């Protein structure tokens, strides 16, 4: 069943046949909006139905009605109607086409159902008569776009099918969820505008295939980096450059999701383009995907230069001794002045809250972990000194890592 029916009137200054009119419509609209919106292509794909023409001749003039069933959406159907109005010739004769009406066939069908419902109810009699208003309300509710649900302890905006879907789409905010729901995507969940990736997203990502769908601007880049540092992602999809997910049409959403890129392919392309952080993100994603780790060793030349040029103040040894057994950390400036002394339990959060390159070195009474290294690399800390070294899978040549024993 078609969604809409375009009704148009045609007037021609001459006597023509129906097939002449249909041929003129196909011929004069061909190629105006490219092959994708060609009437023959639309018919082949079932997007529009068979064009019907009813004519009558009076003297030397022909008038008639054109009927075109459409399965396109509202905007595309209106565009199609405007397109056929551009036909101004049928054979050698001048012609004009004007749109009389665009009928929503679904609403017409619902109207007939409602009329028939009332008729049936009247026949049943008053004692069997249900509340017609409730019936109408139920039908209206059925036709409404689903509202986002609140998911997880963080009450993240989401579609109704997140739990039962094998694959989910992760977007930025509530407006993105609403837009995707409008076009039938129900396996979506938003980050909720949180500064950090919610635990609910991390847990879902461990259990399901995930596509991260972000805006096509700098904001989308920042969100992508934050998510890739914290949650397992299988595919990346992006809105067109400069566009936001919440404003995309059904077709634009479909095209963006069709063009989604496998996460490691995407990050490897970023590495080739000179994105320094992409190599770190590859290691993080490999760990989140539970793949064998690729230990990246710094080039020997660079490592040698770091060793040769590293200069530590004498007072640092005294600071290290004062840290033994305290479970505390000290932040240093580039001049080796103490900037801050904090409990080790707050170390990662304090690093993440700092500005890049504000911290030159960190010394702490604790274990150097991969999570800690990821945090200091992001903030471009130069030296990290801890009590012991844990399991390390990746570090950059720019970061010097030492233990208390090496400096004792």
From Swiss-Prot:
This is DNA primase DnaG. The keyword Lipid metabolism does not apply. Keywords: DNA replication, DNA-directed RNA polymerase, Exosome, Magnesium, Metal-binding, Nucleotidyltransferase, Primosome, Transcription, Transferase. InterPro entries: DnaG_primase (IPR050219), Primase_DnaG_arc (IPR020607), TOPRIM_DnaG/twinkle (IPR034154), TOPRIM_dom (IPR006171). Mg(2+) 2 binds at residues 215, 217. Its cofactor is Mg(2+). It comes from Desulfurococcus amylolyticus (strain DSM 18924 / JCM 16383 / VKM B-2413 / 1221n). Forms a ternary complex with MCM helicase and DNA. Component of the archaeal exosome complex. PANTHER family: DNA PRIMASE. RNA polymerase that catalyzes the synthesis of short RNA molecules used as primers for DNA polymerase during DNA replication. Also part of the exosome, which is a complex involved in RNA degradation. Acts as a poly(A)-binding protein that enhances the interaction between heteromeric, adenine-rich transcripts and the exosome. Mg(2+) 1 binds at residues 172, 215. Belongs to the archaeal DnaG primase family. Binds two Mg(2+) per subunit. It is an enzyme of class 2 (transferase). It catalyses: ssDNA + n NTP = ssDNA/pppN(pN)n-1 hybrid + (n-1) diphosphate. One of its GO terms (cellular component) is cytoplasm. Its EC number is 2.7.7.101. Pfam families: Toprim. Residues 166-241 form the Toprim domain. GO terms for molecular function: DNA-directed RNA polymerase activity; metal ion binding; poly(A) binding. It comes from the Archaea. One of its GO terms (biological process) is DNA replication, synthesis of primer.
